[in-house]
Amino acid sequence: MAGDLLQPCGMKPVRLGEAVVDLLIQRAHNGTERAQDNACGATATILLLLLCLLLAIRHHRPHKSHIPGPSFFFGLGPVVSYCRFIWSGIGTASNYYNSKYGDIVRVWINGEETLILSRSSAVYHVLRKSLYTSRFGSKLGLQCIGMHEQGIIFNSNVALWKKVRAFYAKALTGPGLQRTMEICTTSTNSHLDDLSQLTDAQGQLDILNLLRCIVVDVSNRLFLGVPLNEHDLLQKIHKYFDTWQTVLIKPDVYFRLDWLHRKHKRDAQELQDAITALIEQKKVQLAHAEKLDHLDFTAELIFAQSHGELSAENVRQCVLEMVIAAPDTLSISLFFMLLLLKQNPDVELKILQEMDSVLAGQSLQHSHLSKLQILESFINESLRFHPVVDFTMRRALDDDVIEGYNVKKGTNIILNVGRMHRSEFFSKPNQFSLDNFHKNVPSRFFQPFGSGPRSCVGKHIAMVMMKSILVALLSRFSVCPMKACTVENIPQTNNLSQQPVEEPSSLSV
């Protein structure tokens, strides 16, 4: 029984059937595929983890790649944004894009990437860095008005700009600054003594042109010192300024069509020729002078030219820019201030009371200027609430990072300072109120003249001029504009600067 149950064990060759062989091969193949699948799955998992890691790093790193702004959309975005700047003006377009996309916006001007900044920290970053001492604008446009690598305002030849800036700094500080108050007071009073040429048959006074006449006379006495026809020169300055803001960002094709820009080229040349004639008068004056106790701005430039330091064209452009700087900025600022005074009679009363208290019946002295604190707050609030120049244009000289955004070398920058001045730092940002300057305002929130290496070189003399002219004017007259003549109601343009549309009936007082 046991033998039947337990047969002897032996190994005998067995021929496997084809079906069995196929089954074994299939199992081996399936094992290989499973191994390959496992390897592929592991690789995919690793790649997925690496991708997540890269995304996490990208999310947490400070540099951002996408700046808010209009879409490129196959090149249509750059065309539309450029057309808006050309059509509505640089200032108006900048306000539009900041309002729509935020305080850091990317647009295009003439195909070039341009950032519009109104965030105070971003604006301050650009102002204080020498990386942004260059400006941008049409090369052919700047050549048309003589500003390409000449003068100081739009000169982007940094080495030459630094050289000529030294002449401006010397003229606008030191002895020149000390003489400013007396010259402003004398000029204002002499013009107020003879208002006949600026008064119409109804007794209405063209106050804006009065202020321009005063300012151009002050500029001549301080920096040029030759006889000139104020009204004739002001007409040429006005046409030059119109040309400046017209050609500044025009495309190159505009200048290849002579019939399009012929008028502007002629208007620019008229002022250049007038300034050349005034410089020649100055040379004759210097040649006949018995002694040279005081060398003004133009005299210093003439001697620099004679020593081979500056070209004749650069001397002409420097004098031209010194002469035009105030009539279309400071004079219009004063005009807006007078309108704001009449819209805020309580402020006018405070200023008049302060003048009576500080001057105490005396004529204005240098020692009085620092004591006119209410007047200074009024000037600052006027420059904040309704600035004439509410933006500045720069170009990046190297790669940089602004508020976490990568900025490439050559990027255009528009600092929308006027919009920045309406920030929540001020207690009443959207109202005209001296309360906004009740306490000290840090420079990063208030930049009427800029700061850093390319700040306005005449910012100190400008404050002296405004105080002196306002004191002289308010001591003798009260300005009463027509009812419709308010800062909010008068027609204005905002291209290169905010300027009233000069309709005589609306600007008379």
Swiss-Prot record:
Coiled-coil regions listed: none
A GO CC term assigned to this protein in UniProt: membrane
Cofactor: heme
Residues engaged in binding heme: 456
Broad class of the protein's primary localization: membrane
Membrane topology listed for this record: Peripheral membrane protein
Catalytic activity: testosterone + 3 reduced [NADPH--hemoprotein reductase] + 3 O2 = 17beta-estradiol + formate + 3 oxidized [NADPH--hemoprotein reductase] + 4 H2O + 4 H(+); androst-4-ene-3,17-dione + 3 reduced [NADPH--hemoprotein reductase] + 3 O2 = estrone + formate + 3 oxidized [NADPH--hemoprotein reductase] + 4 H2O + 4 H(+)
E.C. no: 1.14.14.14
Keyword Iron: yes
GO MF annotation list: aromatase activity; heme binding; iron ion binding
Function per UniProt: Catalyzes the formation of aromatic C18 estrogens from C19 androgens.
Protein name (database record): Aromatase
Organism field: Danio rerio (Zebrafish)
